[in-house]
Amino acid sequence: MHCRSLPPIANPGSWVLILGTMPGKVSLREQQYYAHPQNLFWRITAEILGFDATSAYPLRVSSLKDHGVALWDVLQSCTRESSLDADIETSTIVPNDFDRFF
């Protein structure tokens, strides 16, 4: 399966960048970072930053931005059969453009 990363979540004032490799199948399908219900990302960040982890995705994203946190992925695209990084076909890796991002 060919995968394309989600757009970055960031504000000009973001000072923390959390990087993943490539969103999993559920996240890509939902077009939401860390969308798999077993992923603890939103519960942990909500606990640290003081927002409701069960709120709608746009509200969670807004909370991250309000706290200066940005999200993105190292890869712009790749091919893999599962959601595991170990399944990424290295010959298909295209990195994101970090020069443009920063």
Specify the residue positions occupied by each region the protein language model found.
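A polyanion-binding, active-site-adjacent surface
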Residues: 1-102
